[in-house]
């Protein structure tokens, strides 16, 4: 079951090790569009043999407009090459404990697009190096605003037609959504207050006048006091998020002959 992942980044050196630890074992190819990172982002990505890094060309264009345009077309090169494509931001960990078997079962059922169930994850401090976030940092809250059509069959979908933020879409082609949603999208943005504040400040500095005028990503402009209050509230309300149900194991074939076949 071949899976190609497409993402974008800017100065993500802190989250990249966790991102690669999650996705490298479960996807076959990772294409990262870099928006002129100046930290160790490119160095860390280059160390992974599955990663191909490309420049994100956007000039003065709105950050969100550029990303919307990118993710409408970048995945099309995987037609005829991959069974599934996954579109995810660096802090979005699409998760199922039986990943390959789950995707194979979905494809056998004729499903061509999978909408992941969104969870806003939170931790009191930044996780230690080597942590497997999806299975060790498991406290958060259900957030339907984070639901996302993260996985689809490239040969079946003509256009995804995302809305801004890519949490909703109006796909065209052979569109068959899964009847039940088992894949999770665990959003690891709130990894300690210090990390959250620093990331908010950095991303706020990247918003263009067009972004601000449209009210896009306005949450990056919140003052530190309100961000701190929201973070404390998230910690207090967080609960352990259970893993999606595992797939039932296929029954073992009995070696014992039935009575009507015995001789």
PLM-predicted stretches and their roles:
Residues 46-87:
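Active-site-proximal specificity loops/subdomain of glycosyltransferases
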Residues 64-72, 96-263:
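Catalytic-site signature of metal-activated, phosphate-bearing donor transferases
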Residues 89-93:
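Short acidic donor-binding/metal-coordinating loop in glycosyltransferase active sites
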């Amino acid at each position: 079951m071949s899976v190609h992942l497409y993402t974008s980044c800017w100065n993500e050196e802190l989250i990249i090790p966790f991102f690669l630890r999650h996705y490298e074992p479960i996807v076959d190819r990772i294409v990262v569009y870099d928006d002129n990172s100046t930290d160790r982002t490119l160095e860390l990505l280059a160390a992974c043999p599955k990663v191909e890094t490309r420049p994100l060309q956007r000039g003065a264009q709105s950050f969100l407009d550029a990303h919307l345009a990118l993710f409408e077309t970048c995945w099309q090169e995987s037609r005829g090459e991959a069974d599934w494509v996954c579109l995810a931001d660096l802090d979005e960990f699409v998760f199922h404990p039986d990943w390959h078997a789950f995707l194979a079962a979905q494809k056998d059922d004729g499903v061509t697009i999978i909408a992941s169930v969104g969870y806003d994850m939170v931790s009191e401090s930044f996780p230690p190096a080597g942590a497997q976030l999806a299975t060790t940092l498991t406290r958060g809250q259900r957030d339907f605003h984070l639901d996302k059509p993260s996985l689809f069959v490239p040969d079946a979908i003509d256009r995804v037609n995302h809305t801004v933020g890519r949490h909703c879409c109006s796909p065209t082609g052979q569109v068959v959504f899964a009847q039940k949603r088992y894949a999770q999208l665990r959003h690891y943005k709130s990894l300690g207050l210090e990390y959250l504040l620093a990331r908010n400040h950095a991303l706020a500095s990247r918003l263009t006048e067009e972004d601000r005028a449209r009210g896009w990503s306005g949450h990056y402009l919140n003052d530190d006091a309100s961000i701190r209050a929201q973070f404390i509230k998230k910690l207090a309300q967080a609960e352990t998020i259970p893993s999606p149900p595992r797939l039932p194991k296929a029954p073992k074939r009995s070696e014992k002959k039935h009575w009507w076949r015995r001789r």
